[in-house]
Amino acid sequence: MRQRTIVCPLIQNDGCYLLCKMADNRGVFPGQWALSGGGVEPGERIEEALRREVREELGEQLILSDITPWTFRDDIRVKTYADGRQEEIYMIYLIFDCVSANRDICINDEFQDYAWVKPEELALYDLNVATRHTLALKGLL
């Protein structure tokens, strides 16, 4: 089984949290709402990976004004690729509290939508199990 270290930003701006709706046909949680993030490449520093993933998934214009390591966890997930293949992966999540200086988002094709959500409205979204766990651990659910 392959192992991946995943950097995952919990991005907050003006009291709201950024959620991204995964594409329906790929990813670990197709069609569900999630936090952004992705894998650390070999030789890449963790904060560099976090900033790269934010740029790739959310666009160059989103500015993170604060990044603080928060917690970590692990689990085993099945990833679905765009061609329909599936793979079981051992995932190590490094989760960061992040504050953005703006809300300028340009999502890539991994996502079909995004939303800035007030804490009291987070439970209304179809959150994947990992995001639900993270938000509950943070006291937001």
Curated annotation (Swiss-Prot):
Its cofactor is Mg(2+). GO terms for molecular function: dCTP diphosphatase activity; dTTP diphosphatase activity; dUTP diphosphatase activity; magnesium ion binding. It catalyses: a ribonucleoside 5'-triphosphate + H2O = a ribonucleoside 5'-phosphate + diphosphate + H(+); a 2'-deoxyribonucleoside 5'-triphosphate + H2O = a 2'-deoxyribonucleoside 5'-phosphate + diphosphate + H(+); dUTP + H2O = dUMP + diphosphate + H(+); dTTP + H2O = dTMP + diphosphate + H(+). Keywords: Hydrolase, Magnesium. It holds the Pfam family NUDIX. Its EC number is 3.6.1.9, 3.6.1.12, 3.6.1.-, 3.6.1.23. The keyword Transmembrane does not apply. InterPro entries: Nucleoside_triphosphatase_NudI, Nudix_hydrolase, NUDIX_hydrolase-like_dom_sf, NUDIX_hydrolase_CS, NUDIX_hydrolase_dom. It is an enzyme of class 3 (hydrolase). A motif (Nudix box) lies at residues 38-59. Residues 1-141 form the Nudix hydrolase domain. The keyword tRNA processing does not apply. Monomer. PANTHER family: GDP-MANNOSE MANNOSYL HYDROLASE (PTHR43046), MUTT_NUDIX FAMILY PROTEIN (PTHR43046:SF14). Catalyzes the hydrolysis of nucleoside triphosphates, with a preference for pyrimidine deoxynucleoside triphosphates (dUTP, dTTP and dCTP). Belongs to the Nudix hydrolase family. NudI subfamily. This is Nucleoside triphosphatase NudI. The gene is nudI.
